[in-house]
């Protein structure tokens, strides 16, 4: 089943960076014990229209870019939590998390999704969705093995979130 991606008007996009989203970003950063990155709605940085959020660190300054496209509001929040976990990865142990990183073009989508930094970011974002919205992401586009890897990692992360 294909998911509908709806373009959002400039007026609506402005409303997306609202108090709820800013509060969510602040709360996730607080959980991760990381500084809040700059937030930009300059969606022109996106190479394709399937991503909803993207983290970029330039000269040591992190910026979270928010796209003008979303599948659902929950998907949007998931993408934000996922990208904030990537910031945490860079700030806590960049060599460990990104040491063997490969792009999807280099290794294909399945191997890309199974990289430790992606498994970790997906697991963290899934837990945040459960805690924040009582929603359990099902990852329908991922194969069973990748979903299992995310589930195992989520169980490892859970005690960190109980503190």
Where are these regions (language model features)?
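Substrate-binding/catalytic groove segments of enzymes
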Residues: 88-100, 130-140
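Long, well-structured alpha-helical subdomains associated
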Residues: 111-114, 123-163
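Charge-rich, solvent-exposed alpha-helical interaction surfaces
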Residues: 24-27, 31, 83, 149, ...
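Post-HEXXH active-site segment of zinc metalloproteases
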Residues: 74-75, 90-119
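Active-site recognition of the HExxH zinc-binding catalytic motif
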Residues: 78-91, 121
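Catalytic zinc-binding patch centered on the HExxH motif and its immediate surroundings
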Residues: 31, 38-63, 70-74
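Acidic/histidine-rich, surface-exposed loop or edge segments in extracytoplasmic proteins
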Residues: 2-11
């Amino acid at each position: 089943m294909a998911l509908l991606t709806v373009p959002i008007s400039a007026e609506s996009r402005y409303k997306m960076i609202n108090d709820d989203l800013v509060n969510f970003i602040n709360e996730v950063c607080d959980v991760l014990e990381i500084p809040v990155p700059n937030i930009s709605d300059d969606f022109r940085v996106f190479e394709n229209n399937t991503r909803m959020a993207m983290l970029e660190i330039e000269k040591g300054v992190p910026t979270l870019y928010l796209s003008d496209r979303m599948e659902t509001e929950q998907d949007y929040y998931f993408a934000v939590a996922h990208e904030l976990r990537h910031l945490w990865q860079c700030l806590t142990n960049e060599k460990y998390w990104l040491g063997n990183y490969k792009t999807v073009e280099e290794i294909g989508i399945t191997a890309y999704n199974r990289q430790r930094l992606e498994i970790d970011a997906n697991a963290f974002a899934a837990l945040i969705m459960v805690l924040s919205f009582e929603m359990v992401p099902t990852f329908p586009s991922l194969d069973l093995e990748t979903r299992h890897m995310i589930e195992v990692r989520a169980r490892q992360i859970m005690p960190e979130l109980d503190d």
